[in-house]
From Swiss-Prot:
GO MF terms held by the record: nucleic acid binding
InterPro entries: Restrct_endonuc-II-like, tRNA_endonuc-like_dom_sf, UPF0102_YraN-like
Organism: Legionella pneumophila subsp. pneumophila (strain Philadelphia 1 / ATCC 33152 / DSM 7513)
PANTHER family: UPF0102 PROTEIN YRAN (PTHR34039:SF1)
Lineage: superkingdom: Bacteria
Family statement: Belongs to the UPF0102 family.
UniProt-listed Gene3D superfamilies: 3.40.1350.10
Protein name according to UniProt: UPF0102 protein lpg2994
Length: 118
């Protein structure tokens, strides 16, 4: 996915999540361990969101495109974020995936798509 398409997909996802009652905490959190596209708040939960845009759905949707290694990077970046901001054990967390069909811009929201145990 090109950087321009990625930013467009993230903005679509962000707007969709806000329309569904989530609040933005941070966008594009980067650390040496990995990155997190969106960090949102839903009730008491901190929700760490991976955004995937697929122009060809023949090989599965967004979740199918997230490898074990990518999940590990997201989990490590989440730990880094929680420690950096001293909020570990203060909020329950969840890992969601927003999958966007690159042709139609149809959004699929997979709540609790994976956990820290992968």
């Amino acid at each position: 996915m090109t950087q321009e398409k990625g930013k467009f997909a993230e903005q679509l996802a962000l707007n969709y999540l806000k329309e569904n009652g989530l609040a933005l905490v941070m966008q594009n959190y980067h650390c040496r361990l990995g990155e997190i596209d969106l960090i949102m708040r839903e009730g008491s939960y901190l929700v760490f969101v991976e955004v995937r845009s697929r122009s060809n759905m023949n090989f599965g949707g967004g979740l199918a495109s997230i490898t074990y290694e990518k999940k590990q990077k997201i989990i490590k970046a989440t730990s880094h974020y929680m420690i950096k901001y001293r909020i570990q054990d203060k909020f329950p967390i969840r890992f969601d995936v927003i999958s966007i069909d690159g042709k139609s811009n149809k959004i699929t929201w997979l709540k609790n798509a994976f956990d820290a145990g992968c």
